[in-house]
Structures are given as C-alpha cells and as structure tokens.
Amino acid sequence: MKEGQYPPYKASGMAYISFARRQPQLFKVLFMRDRTGEPQPAEDELTRRIIGLIMKNTGLEEQAAYTLHIELWIFIHGIASMLVTGYLNLEETVISTMVTDVYQGLLARKKEETA
C-alpha cells in the first residue's frame, strides 16, 4: 500500500488490513483478544472525531454517521480476521474494490433513510 493511494478514511481501513497481513500474530494479540470491560466505540474520543468527519464529508446526521462507521469497521475487521486465520487470501485490489462497494452501498442507504 502506497501513501496517498486511497482517500484518508479508506486508507485507515486498508492500513488495518495491511497490518493484519504483515503482522498476523501481533494483530491477533492486539485485536482478537477478549475486550470485555473496555470502552465501547461510541465512548472513544477517536471514534467521536471520526464520526464528526464523516458527518462533515457526507452530510449524514450523527447516528447515521456512527452506524455507517461501525458497519464499515466490522466489515474491515472481518476481512483482516479472515486473512490472519488463513480463511481468505485476497489481493489488495480485490479488497479495495470490496471496501469501496460496501462504503458506497451503505452511504447510499443511509442517505436514502434520512431523505
């Protein structure tokens, strides 16, 4: 993955997947452990900032932006988890297309719901 290859929001997800591919054992330790008792994403300052940027860039209301982000993050984490467990072995270009398709589909649905 090259710097500037993707828009910033997509780049964060693609970097997460790239990290999983490059460092599968570390990824498992960091992101595939019991998280019981940890703050939920809605309580996290970084998540709140991301939601603000999504709202600004898409025109979505706060709840729709939050749901969009969480749905996308679950999708991204799912791909990364499937890569590190050997369940999937997809090329970056295929993953990029999938991420774009899901983002565009979710965004269109959120905008339709709030229209």
Where do the PLM segments sit?
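Amphipathic C-terminal alpha-helical segment
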Residues: 26-29, 33, 74-91, 105-114
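Generic structural signal for well-ordered, non-membrane alpha-helices
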Residues: 18-25, 48, 52, 74-78
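A short, mixed-charge helix-start or loop-turn motif at secondary-structure junctions
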Residues: 2, 33-36, 58-61, 88
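Short alpha-helical scaffold segments that flank and stabilize functional sites
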Residues: 15-16, 23, 68, 83, ...
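Juxtamembrane/interface motifs at transmembrane-helix termini
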Residues: 4, 48-49, 85-89
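Hydrophobic side chains within well-formed alpha-helices
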Residues: 5, 16, 26-27, 46, ...
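Hydrophobic alpha-helical connector segments
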Residues: 1-22, 62, 72
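Amphipathic alpha-helical packing segments from all-alpha helical-bundle domains
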Residues: 35-59, 66-70, 96-111
